[in-house]
Amino acid sequence: VSQTRKIAVVLKGYPRLSETFIAQELLGLERAGHDLVLVALRRPTDAKRHPVHDEIRAKVFYLPEYLHDEPWRVFRSLMKSLPKAGFWRALVPFIRDVGRDWTRNRFRRFGQALVLFAEWPAEARWLHAHFIHTPASVTAYASIMAGVPWTCSAHAKDIWTSADWELSEKLGRARWTVTCTRSGFEHLKSLTDEKSRVHLSYHGLDLHRFPSFEGDHSNRDGSDASDPVRILSVGRAVAKKGYDILLKALSLLPADLHWRFEHIGAGDLTKELRTLAEHLGLAPRVTWHGALDQKDVLARYRASDIFALACRVAVDGDRDGLPNVLVEASSQRLACVSTRVSGIPELLNNDENGLVVPPEDPRVLAAALERLIRDPALRRRLGAAAERRVRAEFDHHSSVSQLSGLFESEWRKSP
């Protein structure tokens, strides 16, 4: 890589099982010759790791998640920073931000930036934030303190739950921002005059980790009680994933259909969803696996007949971008049914390479599920078309090379 600089990548948490797309990108950047150090705002909460995490060589540097957890570390950082001009330069925008957002969270982000500035990773000469909400706040303050430029990857929740004034200011300060869905891209472009600094780049998939499935998906059609159709979903048990809608849709399926549903993923709503499944009389047909690593998830894609995800826009505006699990399932020729939310129609076209239904509508979702359960030929057609699209358009190497090019073009401008 020409003009290479050590990049400090600021992440909300690391490693996280639900963020394989970030780990895959980090590994891709390393393999392209970039020198990284990872700066995480919190320690991992997942007991398991994906194989990709073990392949990333970058050192991980943890900031205090809460300032009161490590008061001496924060105090030392403050004492070290007070004599430096960068601290006072960053104080001005921070005070302005506090005037518009008087929250503990705001003070925490400035404190974390202070620790990053005081304990600066050796030789880091560029900052890159993953997520435009809290990680970008820490990065923006640290950038001013250290006099080091920054860039940003924006995703989904971070875009849709942030105030427009804050997004506009961050887009103006970052050298460039990249995002992973057209809906997010258009929204961010509408908030800045620097439209050429906002870029669209789909994460794509490391297709070596998701090689073509050489076997065949089954001809199950829901008529055999001893061999039910297998429906799979992978995703965190959180509101935006719409698992309550999916369970209600399953409860509306005709009594003569034989199926089983498996869920993979952890999350705050797991207990509530299990209770709902019992209340709807679905418990005997539902398996809750919790979080699994990538190898086990791949095996479940291959053993299943249908992949279902009922994404929605949550009450607070949170929503998915383009859920990576839909790309993964499609790579295994698994017929997918999902909703018309955010970036999902950028992957799935209804009746062409998947079924796409309106969000928040269990009846329409149930009708789509019934079609797929009863018709293995339809599943094969949709699954084959979905795989062709993923392998042609969603290879993560193109995303990594685009990012690499963006970094290098900035470095040529400011040697």
Language-model features: where?
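Conserved acidic donor-binding segment of nucleotide-sugar-dependent glycosyltransferases
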Residues: 347-351, 355-362, 371-377
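A structural motif in glycosyltransferase catalytic domains
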Residues: 22, 29, 231, 246-247, ...
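Carbohydrate-associated surface elements
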Residues: 183, 204
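Acidic anion/phosphate-binding donor-loop and adjacent secondary structure
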Residues: 163-165, 189, 205-227
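A conserved nucleotide-sugar
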Residues: 118, 225-237, 243-288, 295-296, ...
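Acidic donor-binding loop of glycosyltransferase active sites
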Residues: 302-317, 334
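Short hydrophobic beta-strand element within catalytic cores of glycosyltransferases
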Residues: 326, 331, 335-338, 348
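Short alpha-helical donor nucleotide-sugar binding micro-motif in glycosyltransferases
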Residues: 291-293, 299-304
